[in-house]
């Protein structure tokens, strides 16, 4: 869980946002 969002549900959005 990253930023309070399950990786399975928000993987790409936060990965792209964080630069991963």
UniProtKB/Swiss-Prot annotation:
<protein>
    <recommendedName>
        <fullName>Venom protease</fullName>
        <ecNumber>3.4.21.-</ecNumber>
    </recommendedName>
</protein>
<dbReference type="GO" id="GO:0005576">
    <property type="term" value="C:extracellular region"/>
</dbReference>
<dbReference type="InterPro" id="IPR009003">
    <property type="entry name" value="Peptidase_S1_PA"/>
</dbReference>
<dbReference type="GO" id="GO:0008236">
    <property type="term" value="F:serine-type peptidase activity"/>
</dbReference>
<keyword id="KW-0645">Protease</keyword>
<comment type="similarity">
    <text>Belongs to the peptidase S1 family.</text>
</comment>
<keyword id="KW-0720">Serine protease</keyword>
<keyword id="KW-0964">Secreted</keyword>
<dbReference type="GO" id="GO:0006508">
    <property type="term" value="P:proteolysis"/>
</dbReference>
<keyword id="KW-1015">Disulfide bond</keyword>
<keyword id="KW-0020">Allergen</keyword>
<keyword id="KW-0378">Hydrolase</keyword>
<keyword id="KW-0325">Glycoprotein</keyword>
<dbReference type="InterPro" id="IPR043504">
    <property type="entry name" value="Peptidase_S1_PA_chymotrypsin"/>
</dbReference>
